[in-house]
Amino acid sequence: MSVHHAAYIDYALRVTENMTDVMTGSDTVTLKSYQHFVSRVFLGLDKMHSLLLFHETGVGKTITTVFILKHLKDVYTNWIIILLVKKALVEDPWTYSITKYAPEILKDCIFITYDDKNFHNKFFTNIKTISSRSRLCIIIDECHNFISKSIVKEDGKQRPTKSVYNYLLKNVALHHHKLICLSATPIVNSVKEFIMLVNLLRPKILNNISLFENKRLINESELINKLGAICSYIVTNEFSIFDDVEGSATFAKKNVYFQYVNMTQKQEQVYQKAKSAELKAGTSSFRIYRRMAATFTFDTFLDKTDKTPEEIVNEQVTLYKDFEKFIKTKKFSDHALSHFKKGQSLNGTSSADDISFLNELREHSCKFTDVCLRILASPGKCLVFEPFVNQSGINILLLYFSAFNISYIEFSSRTKNTRVQSVAEFNKRENTNGDLIKTCVFSLSGGEGISFFSINDIFILDMTWNEASLRQIIGRAIRLNSHVLTPEHRRYVYVHFIIARLSNGDPTVDEDLLDIIRNKSKEFTQLFKVFKHTSIEWIYEHQTNFSPVDDESGWGALISRSIDENPTTKRVPRIARGQNIWYSHSNRMITVYKGFKTDDGRLFDSDGNFIQTIQANPVIKIHNNKLVYVLD
């Protein structure tokens, strides 16, 4: 049916043939061709009531959306624009971009923050004040967060955001409104998020069907057939975050490194106590104690058993102050700092005080110490991701920065009032090489909605629970023209995963989380392929043999067909002859996978999904006593 979708896309482009690609307010911007294409299709099809902008970070989905909002009155005269966004993103990029390029629509905009505890009340209060003569255009920025907040919890308790989700699902199409969802990572934690997002865009089209069987998408063709034109897909980097990516004229190259650092004996002892405490408390599945212990440990493990919250806080404050006092009484000599900046270790010419101080810092945190040394040796600016803010997180990391004389800004929940301006200072042209501010340390607050320029090194100190969050984090530093001011030989971003390691070789919490991320991504990759093949770009490029239409009267029926719950096309198991092999997508073999190669050269992953056909003379390397096929 995609050929029919192509006919309507063609119709929309004919209707908007004379639409300008220039947007002017107090400043002027010319849209990229892909931005203009999306805008023309969405505005040219008045009955296209919803669209997902699945655009990777840095390609300008905010500007695309502002352009659409600016031209809504080309379609209908009375619009109220409701922007559902995170608090951190109201000012920049949204208010900033609208004021700069479409100030005339600001009076029609209502900002409602979905991370506000009173979000649903504010939403419905505003809805009641809107005239029935006005059409709504609802924007959901970082829609994966909105969807996640709308999922019913395991205890069955409905979350407040779900009532807004239900309202939009019921009323957008019914009352001829429009909805745009934006995300660089539309699925983050579970397949249920895909189902909820699709049903928001195409109400009740999926129902409660099971999409996977043994981690395989049951009927990919049926989904692609029925979900045509559900999204715009602008993703040039489809590689895993763990793979190297070559640079281009507009994007910096990316190399990934796994930096394994050994815990000291003291840190190992505290780590094992943290593990025991998790088992005792029944919280081992969350791994919080181990994650913190793998990052930093005080002289003693803070046992929370039989203690009041006040006692725990007081003990934490005491431990922090003791460590802070220790840090402030010592400093590295210029000689030591000079060695660190050259990437050199302390040696026989170094003072006993410098060597002792470095060892003491490493005793408490192998990861913080390693990162500080790497920051000093980096030729440019650095980003450091640390999800924990208090206790053993950013609070302590900044003491390490002080010890190593590293200049920094902080972007976290505790710097709400200053962080936007701090990023602006960090991004200034005169700080291209990090001469004024070397590093930005950020928590999950910095994973979305902000951009960094001329970054050379990113350090991931602690894993998130999914690849999507890590992709967002890395994407903040690798954006369109993000390195245009950087010297050509430094137009790269090195991503360092800092992984704590135990002396006995047992897997640490860092390694456990890496495995979880990789397993989740297998299903998500298949769903992202569905989005790609149902995008307006893919359809318009590949479905060219269509009969033109002269109106959009048939659009509604085309997009409202339900997914077949009993697909007729099923996989037929077949036996293939071949051998188990190891393979990698990277020449440097950052990640090595187990697969199966058939006698005729077809490669399948461990779940039976086809990867590619291996060339006649493949590149095979030896890695950790394994023969590894390097895929091109």
Swiss-Prot record:
Describe the location of the Helicase ATP-binding domain by residue ranges.
42-204
User: Domain of life of the organism in this record?
Assistant: Viruses
Q: Where is this region: Binding to the cap-specific mRNA (nucleoside-2'-O-)-methyltransferase?
A: 457-524
Entry annotated with the keyword Transcription: yes
> In Gene Ontology terms, what is one molecular function of this protein?
DNA binding
Question: Where is ATP bound in this sequence?
Answer: H55, E56, T57, G58, V59, G60, K61, T62
Protein name, entry field? Nucleoside triphosphatase I
